[in-house]
Regions:
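Long, charge-patterned amphipathic alpha-helical coiled-coil/hairpin "stalk" segments used as oligomerization
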Residues: 49-86
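Flexible, charged surface loops at secondary-structure boundaries
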Residues: 36-42, 66-71, 89
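RNA substrate-binding interface of SAM-dependent RNA methyltransferases
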Residues: 1-50, 114-126
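Short, catalytically relevant binding-site loops at active-site mouths
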Residues: 1, 52-54, 102
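Structured adenosyl-cofactor binding patch, chiefly the S-adenosyl-L-methionine
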Residues: 81-128
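Structural motif
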Residues: 43-46, 72-75, 92-94
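Residue-level signal for well-ordered alpha-helical segments
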Residues: 5-12, 71, 89, 93, ...
């Protein structure tokens, strides 16, 4: 609210413009329903985790889904404590963890989100 209405909007209008595209929902189910209503079809649900699961997919796989435009995607970033197993099992896919040069791969959500969004929607520098 601060960035959309008060001093924050005046201080940083670019952030206010970006947040105009954000919609808040009270649950994952309501987010899926909102996307379904807007897009006319249910989204492919994808989440992130520092662990792998049987339905873990690569960045390349999700990037192809995103660029195909066949179905809407709902990408959910969890918390530092992760999500309940039942919730994890409800997603179509779990995106592979962000791996680095060592075994430790737990990042704050803001850092992980920035890296993941760049890998999914950023320039494909590795194809050049």
């Amino acid at each position: 609210d601060y960035w959309q209405h008060g001093y924050g909007k005046t201080y940083n209008p670019d952030r206010s413009n970006a947040l105009e595209r954000v919609t808040y929902t009270s649950s994952i189910e309501s987010a899926i329903a909102a996307v379904t209503e807007i897009e006319g079809q249910a989204p492919v649900t994808i989440t992130t985790d520092a662990r792998t699961y049987p339905n873990t997919v690569t960045y390349g796989f999700v990037r192809k889904l995103l660029h195909s435009g066949d179905k809407p995607l709902l990408l959910l970033f969890g918390t530092g404590f992760g999500m309940e197993q039942e919730t994890m099992n409800s997603f179509d896919y779990v995106l592979e963890p962000v791996y680095g040069p060592c075994d430790y791969n737990h990042l704050c959500v803001r850092s992980a989100a920035a890296i993941i969004l760049d890998r999914l929607a950023g320039e494909a520098w590795w194809e050049k």
